[in-house]
Amino acid sequence: MRFVVCLSREGFGEFSTDDLTLGRLYEVLAPSESHDMLRIIDDSGEDFLYPASLFEAVEVQEKTATRLHELLAA
């Protein structure tokens, strides 16, 4: 499991960032084919691709990652 924190909501042309919260932790879903995009479940509850530059990776222990996954999925 991989987690990121949102550090920017700067617009990227066609990408709306209205459903992102600065400072919020998001779980990265299946890896995208493009290394500069991340698929996350945003604040709307739907999964979308966002530019990776809006986020910073967060390293957590496996036990913590499992608990975060369960909490974010609820």
Question: What does each of the following model-derived ranges do?
Answer:
Residues 1, 73-74:
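Intrinsically disordered, low-complexity and often Lys/Arg-enriched segments
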Residues 3-5, 9-54:
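Basic/aromatic-rich interaction segments and small domains that mediate binding to polyanionic partners
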Residues 52-73:
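C-terminal structural segments of small proteins and small subunits
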